[in-house]
Amino acid sequence: MSQPSDIVKVIVALPTLSKKPQQGKKKKSKELEEITLQFRKDSKLQNVLDFLSIAPATKYFTNYNLKNSTGDLLLSSEEKTLRELCSDKDEYKVALELKPYNQYQALKHVLTSRDFFGFASETEDGLSNVAVSTGSKFYKLPLKEIKEKSPENEDKDTENKKPTSMNVTDEEKVEFNHMVHGLFETLKKEKKVLLKDLMNTDTSVVTPCLRSINFSPYNPVPAFYRTKGHLFYLQIVTLEGESLQVTAIPSGFYINKSTTSKFDPSPKENDGHVDTVHYTLYDLLASSSKNFVTHISSLEKKFDDLESVTYVRPACTTLNKPWLIPAIPTNGPDYLRTQIDSFNFEPERNFNDEFQSIKEIPTNTLQARIESERIFAKLTHEFTINATKGAMDILYGNGTAMNPDSPLEEQIFLKNNIFYSFVGDLNQTYADKGGDEAAIASANQDLRTLNMLTRLNLPNIHHLLTTIVDFGGKRILAQTPVPGLLSPMGVKITTNEETKEETVSELSSDICVKYGLDENEKKVVFNEEFDEILNDQFAKSFHLKKHTIQGTELVFSSQSKGIVGSDKRHYILDLANTYPLDVEFAKENFDDVKEASKKYPHRQTLIRPELVEKWWATKIENDKVELVKAYEENLYSYNPDAYQVPGVEDETVVEISKYLNEEIIPNVVQDYLNGNIISPYNGEHLADTFHKNGVNMRYLGKFANLVKEELRKQEEAHEAKLAQVIVDNKEYEEWEKSYLQKIETMIKERQAKINKLVQEGKEVPKELTEDLKLDDNEIKKPSTEKPVVVSYDELVPLIKTAELEIISRSLKHILRKYSRSLPPIVIPALISFVFNLLFGTTYNPAPAVESVDPLYPVDQYEFKNLTHDTLLKEIEQEAVVRYRYELEGDWFAEHELYPFTLIRSICNKFGVQLLNKDYFFSTEQLEEYKQSLDKKSRAKYVAPLTTFSVSDLTVIPKIKAIDYSSPISEELWSQGASIINENQKDGLTLLAQSIGFKEEVNSILHSSVAEKYLTLSTIYNKLGLNAEAIAFCRKSCAIYERVCGVDSFELLRALTNLATLEFANESPYNVALIYQRIIQTVSGYGLDKIHHPIFTNIFNYLEQLSLGVQDAKLAVEVLKSLGDFLVSIDGTESLPYAYIKSKLGNLLAADNRFSDALNQIKVAERIFTKELGTNHGSTAQARQWVDGLTNLIKDVNQKKQLQQDQTAASGLKQQPQKSKSGHNKKETTNPDLADKSVDELLSFIEGEDGKSSKTTKKSKSKGKNKK
């Protein structure tokens, strides 16, 4: 925490004419006259201004100056620190002085106020005009408040409570029981119902407090009124329905006399008085509409009750664009959206100049670095938004090409200083590497290099802002141009002396390639200055080896370029080949494949950056080289042109490629098997794991085959074990028979000796009356051998998820192929037709292509000839060519049963949003739906011709852009994590600062912030700070839901962590509630059908919770449900099923339900005998259970019969009695017995009933002897 001297108290005096909004009954004078704030002295004045822009007392003031105590204006002081301004004093007084509006400032005020009035929905972001975002659901989960535990209470609780019990109230127990039963009901619901409910997000949290606020049709201001100070006119409709015509003037706003049919901008009279001029729109509307004030207060209260992450708009990212969107996307009338462009005062932006200038800002202080990073993150995001909008205009045919006479795919565009081009092999650069496919791959690889450069922020090296936009099969590359490269240099006019004809030609640009590949000259060029710059940190950071190409020395790839722009900065371009070629893959799947149709689509198969860094780190660790030394000496570097340029080789590149194939990919499989990585929830989750480990998605097939091979080996080992168990069981039975015969013989012999001695009148020796002395070496003790099991929970989800990803990615490429030549309006017809062919042939066996527009007849397009069978054939071919994977048998059958899992994957990859409505995959589903309608609606209902229609979907862009992450935040996080064990306080402080800086740079609504909160929650939990851990994890969930989606793996992972934390904090209701949400998602996508371990994990936790709240009957229900689930996926003969039956037997026996317990244990014993063997410990224990319970039940029945016989014999009429465990008294179950040993349980049961019969004891003794 900061020292007092580092804090300054900033007192802001407010203007006296302020009519700031008052909430409730507050004190008047002082609070309205000034506000007091506290800041660190190193904070800038801009931080004060930022706070004033959101503070309730000042947020409606948008046009003012600050004056210091001497009356001097603080103009251009935003970047000064408060320490400089206050002369290091502890108090600093400033006054807020309002300024007269000009048109620009008045417009700014209207737009700012409009956001505060509820017109800025939290579901809107920079791409809302090209894709739909939806609202939140997490904040609607009725989670109980986080339990706070003081150390004193915790120690007391630990002393008093039983080992398995939780400190919960009776009310909590009831709520938990109800929630678990609700979870059972969720499991029974249809998958399409679960998904429809899951994806049906709520309406916007932010709701408008006015009906509308627009510019009046009387704009622009007539010349006569300009000199009277009129700036513009507004038309506002209040919630009461009253239409207000408002005039904006330098001193504020007033209601004028205009109507919809008459223009009179003079002040309106109210009760004989001229209406007041109000400086803010809030004051004007508050005086005119009671509902406005009420709704503003209600909205602000709603904000106060919610976490800010629920409603804030994204600043440096975009919201998730889900594959299922509300059936009727709302789009209320708002003329201001179109009117605002006519008041655009912003000059045309030069993103490149802004971007390069930020790199050159001095960052000598921490605050300067943070400010630089914040601007950098904001700029890259704004570029992405602008580039995407520009690309979409071009794709929709609204752009003007620089070369309009060229074919569409060759056209280039320059709009708002952003250069656009279609990605393809236009110059035949990749002619021998796959053509357009290679060019498309290289664009991704170039962007990866740029992302790395952005993080490194190397001095003197400049690159271009870049965004890739994929839409409808076309890819557009948007970049900031190199300064001067596209600028016209003038023209040259030449005259033909013979014909006297003049020819006009453009002069060539002075800006040209100085280093690397000069495409115009078809050669590699060298520049010493460029070489020096690149040979330092650039080469070391990317581990590049200096090499010679065409007699020229180069640091980077011979395909890359170095250009000095007109701004004299050194730019590097075309950096795709910076990373090495995956030479092993390229040779095997491209070079050595003779048949063109079986070649991998391209040879641009590079290694990912993560793999290079992992390999490099492994090398220095194995060779025990210091990190600094390895970096400075550029050890373990590679030649980026190796195997790319004929004749250029490098063994290091081969080594990296083998490292990927022979070590990393098998290790990823093993990590899944060992539980080091959780089973993937979906394809995106698997892809994330691949990428973090540096594995390319082209290895999906190899990965799936490795997992299949592991599954085959385990199944073979299991079958071999079962066969061996049969042999061992037979041997054991023979041994047991012979051993018992031996004992019987020994007993007979001893008895004969005793009889002889007795007959002779001799004393019987002690050794003849003691227990038989048996040789322990002859006894076969129960085995504790580890069971041979098949890891279905780990292996099957991996295979099925990999296959799903292969199928959906193959379909993405097929859709790209057919949509590439289509106009945007026809693409939905292609999507709906393909979906109908795949999933709708049961409903309509012969779906037709839907017509979309008379001017675009669908008959002229190639995709119309597709059929269900040919489409499946194409998918199979793509799977083989792109992923080297054979889809076997009737592979599509399971996707027809659960279509939405595959549909979701296709939509997310190609860019499709479907309406969240009822889709009919069979006529039976249609009839079921019709029967659910009332009679009147049923009569009017018109059944759809096909499952999917053009009207059901929209196509959206898929965007890849530079993802900026705060270096300062990462540095602090690394420092904090490294010292957390030695110095907890300082470590946590550094981690908190790291997240604080990350929020300041990227804003709180960012996936990287969510990831940090999730990790922080784990750290706090390990330190025993459960309440804080839960709070952090909840915040992570809220962010992930908005940024990644309600059904994203990131959110599922965070929810799973949250449930574990709530479990540790003894909040069973919260745990069950979270699990219900998880079950809704994973069951809706059919993960229960692919053996995903999340289900068994949830049931196991619920059983522990049930016992923890002393509800053994609920624990029995949970175990029965788990048993039913295991039967549905594995049948009734699996080992896990036997363990569940054994657990059930324990619980039922503890509940005195002996017959039921015996039935469960018999099943367990039978499976244990088959799977583990007769002489395994678990089998022996189960057999002991069976013997003990059988004798116990027999003993109880005998005594009961004896009592009845005695009663009948005595002739007495039997009187009704209250049984100790009768129905008149509620039975209580002791859950503490659930995990006791067999001996302990039997002792408890016998002792409780007072039935320690000799029969039972003999039975137990006999059982022990047999063992």
Curated annotation (Swiss-Prot):
Ranges of the TPR repeats in the UniProt entry: 64-102, 420-453, 716-749, 795-830, 904-939, 1010-1043, 1138-1171
Compositional bias (Basic residues): 1254-1267
Residue ranges, compositional bias (Polar residues): 1203-1219
Residue ranges constituting the Clu domain according to the UniProt record: 329-586
Residue pairs linked by disulfide bridges in the UniProt entry: none
An MF annotation (GO) of this entry: mRNA binding
Cellular component aspect of the GO annotation: cytoplasm
Broad class of where this protein is predominantly found: cytoplasm
Subcellular location, record wording: Cytoplasm
Annotated region described as Disordered, given as residue ranges: 1203-1267
Transmembrane segments: none
UniProt keyword list: Cytoplasm, Repeat, TPR repeat
Bias (Basic and acidic residues) ranges: 1224-1239
Keyword Nucleotide-binding: no
Biological-process GO terms, alphabetical: intracellular distribution of mitochondria; mitochondrion organization
CDD domains noted in UniProt: CLU-central
Subunit structure: May associate with the eukaryotic translation initiation factor 3 (eIF-3) complex.
PANTHER family per the UniProt record, alphabetical: CLUSTERED MITOCHONDRIA PROTEIN HOMOLOG, EUKARYOTIC TRANSLATION INITIATION FACTOR 3 SUBUNIT EIF-3
Family that this chain belongs to: Belongs to the CLU family.
Protein's recorded name: Clustered mitochondria protein homolog
Name of the gene encoding the protein in the UniProt record: CLU1
